[in-house]
Each structure stands twice: as structure tokens, then as C-alpha cells.
Amino acid sequence: MNKDKKLGPILLEKIMEKARDYDFLLKNRYLVSGECGIVEIAEIDEKTEKIDLVLVLGGDGTILCATRYFAPKAIPILGINLGQLGYLSELDPQEIDFGLQKIRAGEYLVEDRTMLEARVRRANQEVAVFYGLNDGVLTKGAFARIINFAVFVDEQYITEYAADGVIVATPTGSTAYSLSAGGAILDPEVKAFIITPICPHTLAARSLVVADDKEIRIVVKTALESSMLTVDGQQGFGIKPGDEIIIKKAPYQAKFIKLKNRSFYQLLREKMREANRYHD
């Protein structure tokens, strides 16, 4: 649970009370805002074989953080939205009773979502590795100067960009930063990544969809000291000229509990409508 959400402690108490009615055993842990770490994570690691699923109370950022800990252990996540849009959440707070009843009856599905692996190579040595559900982003940082970089797919040269950066997104991440930068929306069942340049200095640049069994390599030609690789907007690493960023499919997938009989396109309509109301 994200402790920074005011509704969180109240909702948590309700869940704990209801869980006793359904003979569930719940263990309370927090995702800490900022560090996005799990308190007493060693204790969780020792007992992961006994965990059937994880309830995550928070916004999309909290869920993104949770996937990094629980996806490698193949533990499903049920998201309960305490944020604004809640695109990754399955339930709103008022649907807790409905959710627990469905879980108790075994009336749910587990949906797999592709995760990505991003590695940084410097002077032929690997210097960083990150995993994420949404995207890996090369960005220029605070100064208004462009980055020059080349993109390769499975060692096949694609093109060279002069741009503010580039986004490599999973289907899940295609509705996030990549969408704002002009990228297409991918159905989660599509086995692909989308490569979307950020403000490219050309009229011809477009986003590119590639199969997710391909390896994407970004070679940085010129960059500022503030240039960064960020993954899911929560992990970051400084990038220098000559660095290579290698992005491919992670060796595991995130697992999400699905309780409602709604398609991806229905969810997309609902969330985009909510986003429009929020911005209005």
C-alpha cells in the first residue's frame, strides 16, 4: 500500500476485516513513496511460496513498483485504485466486497503482461540493468538541447535521430508516455514493442512497432551530462556519449488478477473518458 494516499489506511482496515470473514490470511506491507521500496522485504522473500496474490492499494505508480518485486516470483497482483486514472487497477475502493467474493469463489483470471529488460553498456562493459512494465526512455534532461542516437533492431540498422529522446514501450506502456509522444496504442495481446522518438528534428520520423522477440539497441552519439535512461519513470541512470542501451523482453511477465468481464477496448474507452474529464 502507498502510505501517502489518505484513503489507504481506512481501506486497508476494511480489507483486513473483510478478509477475516472470507478466511483469508493477509499480511500488511507498505510501498514507500519516493524510494518505492518494500518495508521488511526480506520477510516477504522468505514467505513468497505461500503468497497466492498481492493486493496493491495505490495509483499506477505504486503498481508499477510492485511488479518489479513480485513479477520475478510469478505472484499475481490485484490493483485497487487510490490514484487518479488507475489504468492498471482492477478495482475501485467501493468494489472491495465484490473483489473478495470473486477471489473466494475462484472466479477470476490471471492475465500476463510483457515486461522489458534495459541494460546499459559502456566501453564494452555492462554498467546497469533495470526491469519495467511500461517503458524505457532515453531523455535529454533539463537542458533544451537534442540528443543524437542511432537505433538498431537485432543488429539491423534502422535510422539515426536528432531528438529530445526516445521511448521503447511494451503494449502496457503504449498507453502512457509513448501515447503522449504520438505513438500508437498496442493491444496487450500483441507481442511487440513500440519505439517512439520524442520531438524528433525531422518531418519523417514515426513510431515503429517491432516483435518483442527482437533486441533493440540504442547507440548514443552525443548527449548532455544530464541525459538519462529512465525505466517506468522510477529508475534512472546517467547516459554518456558512446553508451549503448539494449532493450529486450524480460525473462518473466507481470501477472494481474482480472475479475471483470470487460475487454481491453472497453477499459480503454473508460479510462480515456476519465482522463478527459480529469483534464477538463
Curated annotation (Swiss-Prot):
Provide the active-site residues from the annotation.
Answer: D60 (proton acceptor)
Gene3D superfamilies xref list: Probable inorganic polyphosphate/atp-NAD kinase, domain 1 (3.40.50.10330), Probable inorganic polyphosphate/atp-NAD kinase, domain 2 (2.60.200.30)
- Cofactor(s) the record lists: a divalent metal cation
Which InterPro entries did the record assign? ATP-NAD_kinase_N, ATP-NAD_kinase_PpnK-typ_C, NAD/diacylglycerol_kinase_sf, NADK
Q: Where in the cell is it found?
A: Cytoplasm
Q: Which UniProt keywords are listed?
A: ATP-binding, Cytoplasm, Kinase, NAD, NADP, Nucleotide-binding, Transferase
Q: Kindly state which reaction or reactions the protein catalyses.
A: NAD(+) + ATP = ADP + NADP(+) + H(+)
One Pfam family it belongs to: NAD_kinase
- GO MF terms, alphabetically ordered: ATP binding; metal ion binding; NAD binding; NAD+ kinase activity
What top-level class of enzyme does the UniProt entry assign?
transferase
Q: Does the keyword Cytoplasm apply?
A: yes
Q: What positions does the entry give for NAD(+) binding? A: D60, G61, N134, D135, R145, D164, T175, A176, Y177, S178, L179, S180, Q234
Q: What are the EC numbers? A: 2.7.1.23
GO cellular component terms given for this protein:
cytoplasm
Family listed:
Belongs to the NAD kinase family.
Job description of the protein: Involved in the regulation of the intracellular balance of NAD and NADP, and is a key enzyme in the biosynthesis of NADP. Catalyzes specifically the phosphorylation on 2'-hydroxyl of the adenosine moiety of NAD to yield NADP.
- Report what the protein is called: NAD kinase
Q: Can you name the source organism?
A: Carboxydothermus hydrogenoformans (strain ATCC BAA-161 / DSM 6008 / Z-2901)
Name the gene: nadK
